[in-house]
Amino acid sequence: MQPTNFNTLINWQQCSEEQQKALLSRPAINASERITATVSDILDRVKAEGDSALRDFSQRFDHVQVADIRITASEIAAASARLSDDVKHAMAQAVRNIEIFHNAQKMPVVDVETQPGVRCQQITRPIASVGLYIPGGSAPLPSTVLMLGTPARIAGCQRVVLCSPPPIADEILYAAQLCGIQEVFQIGGAQAIAAMAFGSESVPKVHKIFGPGNAYVTEAKRQVSQRLDGAAIDMPAGPSEVLVIADSGATPAFIAADLLSQAEHGPDSQVILLTPDAAIAQAVAVEVEQQLALLSRADIARQALESSRLIVTNDLQQCIDISNAYGPEHLILQIRQPEEIIDQIDNAGSVFMGDWSPESAGDYASGTNHVLPTYGYTSTYSSLGLADFVKRMTVQQLTPQGLLGLASTIETLAQAEQLTAHKNAVTLRVTALNNALTAVNKE
């Protein structure tokens, strides 16, 4: 059962298992062979030719002749001066909340004695250098700068590099300044990912790359993450999505606004409404059409609605089960007492509870991070946080008594795995300790 548009109400119980599976399928995102090959060529050229290739690709893809790849401090200051105070104050408020939430994520040192004389610790260190990719296009995304730059600063990353297609919007440059980012480069697309992964005369190589992008950027991140000479990435990326669970007390206008706020991201976005109330579903369909007519990106949102769903269920529990199976990037619970069911939610990037928690709050300023796993990756990946900008190390320290107390266990396991050198590393020390003890006793 494939609906032709978002006005079609689908009764979940009347669908076969195969139809239900199809209803929860997402728009395909597999990179075409052409994109894969093009990106591979871009990576190789940037690695071999550096800035020359970056300027060539800027001319070819962005239709901009770039003389200086790096944005100067004076250019950032000028951009900041052009911004209105309202925008600056809004960004400052967002940063404050993001700081509070991400500061709370700092991990304490784990320090335990697993048995007498055996001390084990877990400590964290910041990733030394990170690269942030901020898309260009028809609308700037300064909020993504804040979402990436703030935790990078809190984590203590020594070097934070930002790349964005030319010309870079004033809002992005000011957001970078607000986050303390000094190395900003006007390059975009797969070539920007290549520059940060391999380095060039102007752009420093980084250890890990963060940020969203189009199919070419996504494919470039995938490829560099699989190369020994490349860089790690934040998470696999897919089209944006939202799933709303609504009960009979929900407000259709609120639901429609939340669905459309996701649909306007791109034609490959997907939005889903789950409700046991058919009247609510029908009212939402009407609201969507009315609000859609007023949107500046109505054409984009309408395309996204073609692969979206209005699903009527038997009850609220069935909504929860379907949502967990789908694993949405954003999950909105427009139900009474949402806190009573949050423990049943297993797979979601970020959850918005109640009528007064629009997705937009998390996208911009509540404090949570808006970089989230999509495309079903919520079953194994988490929303971006401070942990993504640090790495964990374990430390162990054994006293002589600690080693003696653990020696037979280690030797037995090493012998079972036929790893003689592992066993010898313990046996030699035990022998040395016993010899020393014997010598002391003789004295």
From Swiss-Prot:
Keyword annotations of the record: Amino-acid biosynthesis, Histidine biosynthesis, Metal-binding, NAD, Oxidoreductase, Zinc
Family note: Belongs to the histidinol dehydrogenase family.
GO biological process, one term: L-histidine biosynthetic process
Function: Catalyzes the sequential NAD-dependent oxidations of L-histidinol to L-histidinaldehyde and then to L-histidine.
Catalytic machinery residues: E329 (proton acceptor), H330 (proton acceptor)
GO molecular function, one term: zinc ion binding
PROSITE patterns per record: HISOL_DEHYDROGENASE
Cofactor: binding details: Binds 1 zinc ion per subunit.
Binding residues annotated for substrate, in chain numbering: S240, Q262, H265, H330, D363, E417, H422
Superkingdom of this protein's organism: Bacteria
The keyword NAD is annotated on this UniProt entry: yes
Binding site for Zn(2+): Q262, H265, D363, H422
Name of protein: Histidinol dehydrogenase
Positions contributing to NAD(+) binding: Y133, Q191, N214
InterPro entries linked: Ald_DH/histidinol_DH (IPR016161), Histidinol_DH_CS (IPR001692), Histidinol_DH_monofunct (IPR022695), Hstdl_DH (IPR012131)
Record-listed E.C. numbers: 1.1.1.23
Catalysis: reaction(s): L-histidinol + 2 NAD(+) + H2O = L-histidine + 2 NADH + 3 H(+)
A GO-annotated cellular component: cytosol
Names of required cofactors: Zn(2+)
Pathway assignment: Amino-acid biosynthesis; L-histidine biosynthesis; L-histidine from 5-phospho-alpha-D-ribose 1-diphosphate: step 9/9
Oligomeric form and interacting partners: Homodimer.
Signal peptide from the UniProt entry: none
Organism phylogeny: Bacteria, Pseudomonadati, Pseudomonadota, Gammaproteobacteria, Enterobacterales
